[in-house]
């Protein structure tokens, strides 16, 4: 048996949370991450599990995730503290076989619960599992500064917001050809915002919460981080462009189509026409 603190998933979560905090995306207890794990990935670390796991009822049943394992950031925990004490700030949990509850097997050594956005994470995991054939295993939420800033001055519409980001940096269409989805402003930590986010996740791997932050999905922690990082970099460029008086020239529709053909991706049609 191996020590869980040396596992690839704990070490990966330490790196992701540290990187996100250093980016300035996760002030105080802002942001949350969940990583879906396979049973064989957690099995070698059972000696570190609690002998009597704590059971917590889900606010919304998730039978599609029955028996699934997740590594999740804790509610009220600071990303900057994860690398200092991962066992206090992270939690390894398993959804019950009926999808009505979960058991806490490791972590949260000072008590507490997984992220308050667990409902949004689980609903998004269900959808991304379906649309990706099970390859998407990460849901990541943070307060990316420039994406939030743009939500105050741009029309909150999927196609036009996507087009703006595609024009902000050439790599964007290649990295997220499926564009960005947007939900209305809603109270966070509720089942309702989770439902709205999951609906957008059916078509988009990025979902903007206006005036709040961004949700991203991907196969790995690196993929999800890189996705958000790319969109945020484009948003930063566009914030600077707007502050200098707006665009004088930009990437054209024809150039975007040529870019998609070169990298063999299918761009969001509505964004091409926005």
Curated annotation (Swiss-Prot):
The enzyme's first-digit EC class, named in words, is lyase
A single cellular component GO annotation: cytosol
| Classification via InterPro entries | Aldolase_class_II_sugar_metab, Aldolase_II/adducin_N, Aldolase_II/adducin_N_sf, Rhamnulose-1-P_Aldolase
**What reactions does this protein catalyze?**
L-rhamnulose 1-phosphate = (S)-lactaldehyde + dihydroxyacetone phosphate
Annotated positions binding Zn(2+): 141, 143, 212
Q: What metabolic or biological pathway is this protein involved in?
A: Carbohydrate degradation; L-rhamnose degradation; glycerone phosphate from L-rhamnose: step 3/3
What protein name does the entry list? Answer: Rhamnulose-1-phosphate aldolase
State which gene encodes it: rhaD
């Amino acid at each position: 048996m191996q020590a869980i603190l040396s596992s690839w998933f704990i070490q990966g979560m330490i790196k992701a949370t540290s990187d996100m905090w250093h980016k300035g995306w996760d002030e105080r207890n802002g942001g949350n991450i969940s990583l879906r794990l396979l049973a064989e990935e957690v099995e070698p670390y059972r000696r570190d599990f609690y002998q009597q796991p704590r059971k917590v009822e889900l606010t919304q049943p998730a039978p599609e995730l029955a028996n699934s394992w997740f590594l999740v950031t804790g509610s009220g925990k600071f990303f900057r503290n994860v690398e200092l004490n991962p066992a206090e700030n992270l939690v390894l949990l398993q959804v019950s076989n009926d999808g009505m509850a979960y058991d806490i097997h490791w972590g949260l050594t000072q008590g507490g619960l997984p992220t308050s956005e667990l409902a949004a994470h689980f609903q998004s995991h269900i959808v991304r599992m379906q649309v990706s054939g099970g390859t998407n295993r990460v849901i990541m939420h943070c307060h990316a500064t420039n994406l939030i800033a743009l939500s105050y001055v741009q029309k909150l519409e999927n196609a036009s917001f996507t087009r703006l980001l595609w024009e902000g940096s050439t790599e964007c269409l290649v990295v997220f050809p499926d564009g960005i989805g947007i939900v209305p402003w809603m109270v966070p930590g509720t089942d309702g915002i989770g439902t709205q986010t999951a609906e957008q996740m059916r078509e988009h791997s990025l979902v903007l919460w206006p005036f709040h932050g961004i949700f991203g999905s991907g196969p790995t922690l690196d993929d999800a981080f890189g996705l958000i990082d790319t969109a945020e970099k484009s948003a930063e460029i566009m914030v600077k462009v707007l502050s200098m008086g707006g665009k004088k020239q930009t990437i054209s529709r024809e150039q975007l189509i040529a870019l998609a053909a070169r990298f063999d991706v299918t761009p969001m049609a509505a964004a091409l026409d926005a």
